[in-house]
């Protein structure tokens, strides 16, 4: 009985800790942490040369040949989780997507794409690895960027 109480208290503590985390919707997030500095130096040119995704709540998710427009970002009281309706485009393909976004740390968010998860589960995409769930991408917040510089 003592073990059960201890396990439940640990679960409650981690849930409370996650509720304290906030997603800063005014900043740019990148799929590769080193991309923040590259974006600061090169602006939009970094997207041409880089192999990473950017996420902003104003512009959606983008890379050189991929873009997801966010149409609706929903939140609920007492939870840091976000629900996003999106329309995504890649060369020759347009599709709707639903994203779940959760804070994973002070400057990291987890984005789960229902479309990507379905594509992995049906064998269209390769699984991301043994420790990563299908459809999950981690993004790191760029502390100095609220928009991508255009020179």
Language-model segment annotations:
Residues 35-39, 67-69, 87-89, 141-143:
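Sequence contexts marking disulfide-bonded cysteines in secreted/extracellular proteins
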Residues 59-106:
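Contiguous, well-ordered beta-strand patches that form the walls/edges
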Residues 115-151:
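Edge beta-strand at a domain terminus
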